């Protein structure tokens, strides 16, 4: 039986009513017209989720082949175009304090202020980035699947695991400060419930923290229905009606496209959507994948957790690369838009069932007594008895397998049938490809697709399994670097063929000019950094732009943290830029009136992107002061070791585990 180790400090007041009501929670019968009544052919202010559209779709919102538009549906708008109508397309001016410091002390960076910008967001730019043509791809043959599965296991190193119970997903380190999904922000029932049940730490009436208790309370019934019936409601005896109801359910729980403005050169403005996925979708993902994500941190997994630049990862890659002859770096174009459903279906239906154990029930948390005491105390305060389930007999394997299979099948169906809503209220569905960026498993599924396409190409080219296993593969989403024992000529021959094969077979586009086939270690590039004998380097010009043009409104304290973050992000490669960061830190710190430690505490969100995939950052890096140049150099000069599965979880192995695939074959 798998055991999850739950950090004590993750227990918060996020379960309130859901915990107290655990013993008397019931699943109500869904009324006959329950889902149909969410369509309101009335004025916009009167409809709940969507209304019927009374005008044609404008030509600039007509999608390309492979994307379905719901012409008759009108959703709520979240457009910010009017707020920025007087702004130039290049966006706002640089931070005044940073710009003044550069003019007075660092005039060599003035050109960088003119080169870079944070472009103005717009509804058109969001739709244009989403709107990419898709094409049908054929599934793998059974013979190819049989070769791919053991090779994928070789490189991912994921062992079979128990899934997590709905209640225990609360201990995943959720980020609750971001905007809640479309459904919660427009559901009258959820808003009314959240008004009374939101926790004290809620940061606003549109945030996940405001709706967390309402979500946990109501969606447990929905998840129960999915496990029992494969639908988020109790199905009728009419299968056609069930499909209609399910389609309506997907439409009322859409994924909202929010705006993210990327640092850009003024002749190539980049505004991208951020996919605000439904909270219940992410909750189901956590049930199925929490232990998997813990294992992805291990050394024998090819996903590059633990090799972060800030932890000396480039130094480790330099050391390893000495044993190899050639290196391949593939730069994918529009990866998240073009990743075919063929491979995501392969992930859900073929690979995932081989990794989920079904003979021990749900994973048990190792410090069970501490948590069950907390739950019981909360239940008692509500006057509701709560019976401990510590010694509950695990469900029969066949029964549990059906529940797990229903969860996987539903999630895979929703992944394909997800409805996307633009800021100006138009709704679309992808039909052949795409990985939404706002789900829990985005990075893992991207990595899986990346690895699978590579392995399929190696097989198709004619390499044997043993030759393929000689490679050392490092992947993070759509980024990759492959170390090979082959001659440079042999690797070039493969890559030239592979670029055409991926386009013909999967519709995936490789950016040839940004990819690299080399035998020179100093050309190895990982996550935006280039190797320089073990020290990472990158464009200082772009860092100047990022420092001067923050993505969102920032306070003086935020700018202090940003200055620290960019000092680390520059990796001590420029004394001048480090001095700029220090000046910026001193300028904004002087404008605050609180203790430095209080200013910096809890402001990790303002760190640059290199820190985002690194939840353990505070354990290895001091963020309570501005670092010296030597501090940064010392930090990067030595690899700090591979990550462990904790604090996410501890997953033991089994001698003869029974997986979901064994039960369903």
Swiss-Prot record:
Keywords: Nucleotide-binding, Nucleotidyltransferase, RNA-directed RNA polymerase, Transferase, Viral RNA replication. Disulfide bonds: none annotated. GO terms for biological process: DNA-templated transcription. Its EC number is 2.7.7.48. It catalyses: RNA(n) + a ribonucleoside 5'-triphosphate = RNA(n+1) + diphosphate. The keyword Isomerase does not apply. SUPFAM superfamilies: DNA/RNA polymerases. It holds the Pfam family RdRP_1. InterPro entries: DNA/RNA_pol_sf, RNA-dir_pol_C. GO terms for molecular function: nucleotide binding; RNA binding; RNA-directed RNA polymerase activity. RNA-dependent RNA polymerase which replicates the viral genome. This is RNA-directed RNA polymerase. It comes from Atkinsonella hypoxylon virus (isolate 2H) (AhV).
């Amino acid at each position: 039986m798998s055991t999850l180790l739950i950090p004590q400090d993750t227990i918060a007041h996020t379960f309130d009513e859901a915990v107290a009501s655990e013993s008397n929670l019931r699943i109500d019968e869904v009324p006959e017209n329950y889902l149909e009544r969410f369509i309101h052919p009335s004025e916009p202010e009167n409809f709940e989720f969507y209304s019927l559209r009374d005008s044609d779709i404008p030509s600039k919102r007509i999608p390309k082949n492979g994307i379905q538009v719901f012409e008759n549906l009108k959703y709520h708008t979240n457009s910010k175009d009017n707020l920025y109508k007087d702004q130039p397309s290049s966006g706002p001016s640089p931070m005044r304090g940073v710009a003044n410091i550069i003019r007075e002390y660092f005039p060599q960076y003035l050109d960088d202020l003119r080169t870079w910008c944070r472009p103005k967001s717009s509804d058109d730019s969001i739709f244009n980035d989403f709107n990419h043509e898709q094409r049908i791809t054929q599934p793998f043959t059974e013979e190819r699947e049989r070769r791919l599965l053991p090779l994928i296991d070789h490189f991912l190193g994921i062992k079979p695991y128990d899934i997590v119970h709905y209640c225990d997903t609360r201990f995943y380190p959720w980020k609750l400060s971001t905007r809640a999904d479309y459904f919660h922000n427009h559901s009258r029932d959820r808003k009314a419930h959240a008004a009374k049940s939101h926790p004290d730490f809620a940061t606003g009436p549109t945030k996940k923290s405001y709706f967390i208790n309402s979500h946990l309370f109501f969606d447990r019934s929905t998840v129960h229905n999915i496990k029992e019936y494969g639908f988020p409601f109790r199905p009728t005896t009419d299968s056609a009606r069930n499909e209609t109801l399910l389609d309506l359910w997907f439409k009322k729980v859409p994924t909202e496209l929010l705006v993210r403005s990327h640092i850009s050169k003024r002749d190539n403005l980049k505004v991208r959507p951020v996919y605000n996925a439904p909270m219940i979708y992410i909750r189901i993902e956590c049930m199925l994948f929490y232990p998997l994500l813990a294992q992805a941190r291990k050394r024998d997994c090819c996903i590059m957790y633990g090799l972060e630049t800030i932890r000396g990862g480039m130094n480790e890659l330099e050391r390893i690369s000495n044993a190899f002859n050639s290196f391949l770096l593939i730069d994918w174009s529009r990866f998240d838009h073009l990743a075919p459903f063929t491979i995501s279906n392969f992930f859900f239906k073929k690979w995932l069932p081989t990794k989920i154990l079904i003979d021990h029930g749900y994973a048990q948390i190792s410090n069970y007594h501490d948590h069950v005491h907390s739950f019981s105390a909360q239940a008692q305060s509500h006057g509701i008895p709560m019976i401990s389930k510590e010694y509950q007999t695990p469900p029969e394997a066949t029964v549990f397998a059906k529940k797990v299979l229903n969860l996987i099948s539903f999630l895979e169906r929703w992944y394909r049938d997800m409805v996307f809503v633009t800021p100006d209220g138009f709704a679309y569905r992808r039909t052949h490809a795409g990985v939404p960026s706002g789900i829990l498993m985005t990075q893992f599924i991207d990595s899986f697709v990346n690895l699978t396409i590579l392995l399929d190409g190696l097989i198709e080219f004619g390499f044997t399994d043993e030759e393929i296993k000689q490679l050392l593969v490092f992947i993070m989403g759509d980024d990759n670097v492959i170390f090979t024992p082959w001659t440079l000529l042999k690797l070039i021959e493969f890559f030239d063929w592979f670029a055409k094969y991926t386009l013909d077979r999967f519709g995936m586009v490789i950016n040839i000019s940004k990819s690299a086939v080399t035998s020179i270690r100093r050309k190895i590039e990982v996550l935006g950094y280039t190797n320089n004998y073990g020290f990472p380097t990158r464009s200082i010009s772009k860092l100047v732009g990022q420092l001067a043009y923050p993505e969102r409104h920032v306070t003086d304290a935020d700018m202090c943290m940003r200055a620290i973050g960019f000092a680390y992000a520059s990796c001590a490669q420029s004394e001048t830029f480090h001095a700029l960061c220090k000046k910026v830190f001193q300028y904004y710190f002087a404008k605050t009136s609180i203790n430095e430690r209080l200013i910096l505490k809890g402001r990790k969100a303002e760190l640059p992107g290199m820190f985002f995939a690194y939840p353990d950052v505070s354990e290895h890096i001091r963020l309570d002061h501005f670092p010296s140049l030597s501090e940064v150099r010392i930090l990067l000069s030595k690899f700090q070791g591979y990550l462990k599965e904790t604090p996410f979880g501890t997953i033991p192995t089994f001698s003869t585990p029974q997986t979901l695939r064994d039960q369903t074959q």
